[in-house]
């Protein structure tokens, strides 16, 4: 409906151009928003106030001219001017009911497919030298929810898991792997089952033994030179590490597969060419033996230019180099229209610099949108990044296991007579969903405090609340098995029916915002509000005990569409629904 109002306003502007009220070459940005106060209608625009200077008239006068130029439309019952020149649109109840019926009878809930784009999404991207920890949670689940929404909206999505599978630390790890296998193959396999412990043990050997450190450095050189033996060891290690990652992805219900992995090593053969191309365009400078790029747009507090280091003095490459190669690949080979990077906000300057440089070097053209979808940190009660009690890094798999345990205790307390198999099944969904939703419901640009107590609450904007809301709605139909809805129609008569219908009609707008801005919290907030609107409707409007059969069927249809929307919305967040809690 929002896009329909925008279309009506565009037609009105065409009339005003013909009447020479505004110049024919003027391109106005039409913005239509939902009103918060329904006494001011359903939608409002400040378009008239934006045209004041160009039309040389006061806003209310322009607003009236716009209203007079609007085409007749059966979906709009009334248009009014408010305040200094806002234009308020009231949607006809029967038009809203028809929109809801269309959504109910459509697998896509009435959401039209936009012009499809190719969208490359870089997310999760753990360092394979170590096991995944809580710091990887946000990129993984925020990126995955946006990917799901993009695909639902009809876009072609190419997932890119840009894992850290290259670097000097791999010499140390391969040396330790080699050492353990010489002692005992079983010991090596056992230690590799816990990568965090394996990494720490390798680091101790590297720091304490000069002979081990020398061997590790030689292995790095051999690996980078394409040595067959070293490459075999390296591939084995990465395969084991990726297996750990995909166990976590499976538990999280994340859609990443092995086919989506394109790590740093995939660009090794392109890095020297990146340096040559930057050099040939006169963009490279030398600083302390390193090859760098200075850009006038980026300076430190003292006003000195900040470098983008492309190649170290020892010939090694950095993140900027591989990121430039990846951007060129995504633009020219994958033919991306958008490239989204779900990476910590603390990398904002890095991405600003490499995005700007990639355009200057013509690695990408202006047709591709490069977007850093930065996010804040997940913190403990002390407001600092989440750690174990001893100050160590929390492994993601341990966090999920604790969520399962706590969820099982919660579900058992609510259902003391339920059998253990059913309890475990429900607890698994509740535990993982609670961790994911607690994160996704926060503005991604903000830090947040991680709290099991809050995320497992049945009150407020939490996964348990929404999962229970869904089971409550779905449960109505277990008591209405004899009702034939084949010829039923939605009728919006009671105020709470209209409020629920209005909220249901906003699903498309919310998803559009989510995919354009990479903001899952917009969808979370919407689903929470929808559950609240249904609760208010259910209390005020008896469903199975409605006054008439026609009214009962209409309210059952509203309940059915609510259930479909909640299920679809939670599914886009990567959250499985339950029929019973």
UniProtKB/Swiss-Prot annotation:
The keyword Cell membrane does not apply. It is found in: Cytoplasm. SMART domains: Arg_tRNA_synt_N, DALR_1. Keywords: Aminoacyl-tRNA synthetase, ATP-binding, Cytoplasm, Ligase, Nucleotide-binding, Protein biosynthesis. PROSITE patterns: AA_TRNA_LIGASE_I (PS00178). GO terms for molecular function: arginine-tRNA ligase activity; ATP binding. A motif ('HIGH' region) lies at residues 126-136. SUPFAM superfamilies: Anticodon-binding domain of a subclass of class I aminoacyl-tRNA synthetases, Arginyl-tRNA synthetase (ArgRS), N-terminal 'additional' domain, Nucleotidylyl transferase. GO terms for biological process: arginyl-tRNA aminoacylation. It is an enzyme of class 6 (ligase). Coiled coil: none annotated. Its EC number is 6.1.1.19. GO terms for cellular component: cytoplasm. It catalyses: tRNA(Arg) + L-arginine + ATP = L-arginyl-tRNA(Arg) + AMP + diphosphate. It holds the Pfam family DALR_1. The keyword Transmembrane helix does not apply. Monomer. Belongs to the class-I aminoacyl-tRNA synthetase family. This is Arginine--tRNA ligase. The gene is argS.
